[in-house]
């Protein structure tokens, strides 16, 4: 179970392994935890995917919302909590980690806040028995030693992470101001990108896109 329009990589793996993908709509600009859980419970789903903060919206849920969602995960189901952008959430809003909770596995990366996308360093936080199951199917293309050393060094330099957070916040504010000056609005973001609401329909959004391209600004089409 996932949200209709959410980050698509989860979908590819479900399809690749012959699974059935079920989707539920967003609630405004946010993924809808209750709707995801209701659908999972109704369909007896094995996996539920939620990104917090969300890609592509950039919005996020407060810690209490996510912690409540984890507590309500149906029996026999696992919540895949994508926290790729967790380093950018407002102070105090990241949900606490209970490493012994077998209802959730948290996916994180050094590609965003730590700026190490080329090193391909990702990791999961989960209960020991759950993580142990992955050892049975883990392939031999593991993370290289240089990437591991870089990740450990990055963890030791929290001053740099704070600098990156500050720079990203400035960038979001700049993009928001540019949008405002052109009669557009931005969605609140806890990521290193900003979603711009063009405020009308798809035709107008396409016109904005075309004008950006005409002015030498490349915009990657979503998914």
What are the residue ranges of the model-derived segments?
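Active-site pre-lysine segment of PLP-dependent enzymes
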Residues: 15, 31-43, 56-79, 83-116
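PLP-dependent aminotransferase class I/II
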Residues: 103-180, 184-187
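Conserved PLP-binding catalytic core of the aspartate aminotransferase-like
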Residues: 26, 169, 179-215
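Residue-level recognition of strand-loop junctions within catalytic nucleotide-signaling folds
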Residues: 89, 127, 156, 199-200
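Short beta-strands and strand-loop turn motifs
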Residues: 22-24, 47-53, 79-83, 188-190, ...
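PLP-dependent aminotransferase-like
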Residues: 1-50
């Amino acid at each position: 179970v996932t949200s209709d329009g959410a980050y698509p990589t989860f979908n590819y793996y479900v399809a690749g392994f012959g699974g059935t993908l079920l989707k539920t709509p967003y609630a405004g600009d946010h993924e809808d935890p209750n709707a995801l859980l209701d659908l999972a419970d109704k369909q007896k789903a094995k996996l539920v995917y939620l990104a917090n903060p969300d890609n592509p919206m950039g919005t996020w849920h407060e810690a209490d919302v996510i912690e409540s969602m984890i507590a309500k995960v149906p029996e026999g189901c696992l919540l895949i909590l994508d926290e790729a952008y967790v380093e950018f959430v407002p102070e105090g809003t990241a949900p606490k980690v209970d490493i012994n909770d077998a209802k959730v596995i948290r996916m994180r990366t050094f590609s965003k806040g730590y700026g190490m996308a080329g090193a391909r360093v990702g990791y999961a936080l989960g209960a020991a028995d759950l993580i142990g199951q992955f050892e049975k199917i883990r392939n031999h293309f593991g993370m290289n030693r240089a990437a591991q050393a870089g990740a450990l060094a990055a963890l030791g330099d929290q001053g740099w992470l704070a600098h990156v957070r500050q720079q990203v916040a400035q960038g979001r504010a700049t993009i928001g101001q540019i949008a405002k000056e052109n009669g557009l609005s931005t969605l609140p973001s806890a990521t290193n990108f900003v979603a711009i609401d063009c405020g009308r329909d798809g035709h107008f959004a396409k016109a904005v896109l075309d004008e950006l391209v005409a002015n030498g600004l490349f915009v990657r089409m979503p998914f």
